[in-house]
A protein has these predicted regions:
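Glycine-rich phosphate-binding loop of ATP-dependent small-molecule kinases
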Residues: 1-219
Length: 219
């Protein structure tokens, strides 16, 4: 872990020097380890060169725009990282399942999202998307652990339990999302996250590898 963080720190300097923007999006099951993976990434980055964007329900201003507007406005400056803790994929998951958008809207979203990500990549941006995959039993164990730990109780909400009750519906939506929006320019990386340590290593390795490859291809 430390060696990978050291390498990422070196690469961050190179990314800054070469003015390459980097977008990392994290999605996954509730309690899937998004926050822990993001924390291990940011420990390796210069605080002046990254922003973490936690994504929740849109506010009134955001609702008055196209649903992708708030993500466009959070794009990183050249040489910087933006890390999204949840992302624009809410459209084809929670909004689809909870009925916050129409069937036409979420079906149209796959192409809209692919076009947005392609335009980022075409402008010289590295785009990676991580799906943190845990099984239902591991999620139940983590929920219970959070409920019983006073320091972690804030992490578990009624909404988490409601989402869990719709696991099968979410599974269908997730599978369709991964199939329809994993591209060469903005791939999905499925992170087997039942082991938190393994997940954090895989995320770091993937980011390091993607930046190294980009630098080789764009000498």
């Amino acid at each position: 872990l430390k060696a990978l963080q050291g390498r990422l720190s070196e690469l961050h300097n190179e990314v800054y020097r070469r003015r390459i923007p980097v977008v990392l999006a994290f999605e996954g099951w509730d309690a899937g380890g998004k926050g822990g993976a993001i924390k291990r990434l940011t420990q390796a980055l210069d605080p002046r060169g990254y922003a973490v964007q936690p994504v929740s329900a849109p506010n009134d201003l955001e609702k008055s725009h196209h649903y992708l507007w708030r993500f466009w406005t959070a794009m990183p400056k050249a040489g910087h990282f933006t890390i999204f803790d949840r992302s624009w994929y809410g459209r084809v998951m929670v909004e689809r399942i909870e009925g916050f958008c129409s069937g036409d809207e979420w079906r149209r979203a796959y192409a809209e999202i692919n076009n947005m990500e392609e335009s980022w990549a075409n402008s010289g941006c590295i785009v990676l998307k991580f799906w943190m995959q845990i099984d239902k039993e591991e999620q139940a164990r983590r929920f219970k652990e959070r409920q019983e730990n006073p320091d972690k109780q804030w992490k578990i909400t009624e909404e988490d339990w409601r989402n869990r009750a719709k696991w099968d519906q979410y599974e269908v939506a997730v599978d369709e999302m991964l199939v329809r929006t994993s591209t060469t320019y903005a791939p999905w990386i499925i992170v087997e996250a039942n082991s938190k340590y393994y997940a954090r290593i895989k995320v770091l390795k993937t980011v390091v590898g993607a930046i190294e490859n980009y630098l080789k291809e764009h000498k």
